[in-house]
Amino acid sequence: MILTIKPLQGKECNVQVTEDEKVSMVKELVSERLNIPANQQRLLYKGKALADEHRLSDYSIGPEAKLNLVVRPAGERSGMASSSSAVSGVWQTLSTVLAKHFSPADAAKVQEQLVKDYERSLRQLSLDDIERLAGRLLHPDSEGMDTSYMD
């Protein structure tokens, strides 16, 4: 099948792939066509970022689909980006584990639900919860520490 890749600013290109192709391979093909390093590419389909380890079929990407390409500046990984890459690494590891136990479609659904639950849990934390958690992490040996939030 042929996919159209459209950078936010620039000329689009077409790549020939199969639906079982991994996103990382699509990035390599785009790299060859547009001279944009794969590690600086972020592919989006219908507004959703595509993970390198997933296959196109995991996202129901079919023939004649159009992917948007966001190009990250070289050397962008610092500060907040490094912590988000650590979180991203957790999701990539989870994806690998889920792939061993579920079909690609089911693994994607399970991971999507886990991400939603995780984000919902973070939004529900109060400042007091965060303060207690930070205190516990910064002072793990403190005796009189309130640990009721960990139940």
From Swiss-Prot:
Record key words, sorted: Cytoplasm, Transport
GO biological process, one term: tail-anchored membrane protein insertion into ER membrane
Domain of life: Eukaryota
Matching Gene3D superfamilies: Phosphatidylinositol 3-kinase Catalytic Subunit, Chain A, domain 1 (3.10.20.90)
GO cellular component labels: BAT3 complex; cytosol
Main localization category: cytoplasm
Gene Ontology molecular function, alphabetical: protein-folding chaperone binding
Ubiquitin-like domain boundaries: 1-76
Subcellular location: Cytoplasm, Cytosol
Pfam families, alphabetized: Tugs, ubiquitin
Alphabetical list of SUPFAM superfamilies matching this protein: Ubiquitin-like (SSF54236)
Assembly: Component of the BAT3 complex.
Role summary: Component of the BAT3 complex, a multiprotein complex involved in the post-translational delivery of tail-anchored (TA) membrane proteins to the endoplasmic reticulum membrane. TA membrane proteins, also named type II transmembrane proteins, contain a single C-terminal transmembrane region.
Record's protein name: Ubiquitin-like protein 4A-B
Protein source organism: Salmo salar
Gene expressing this chain: ubl4ab
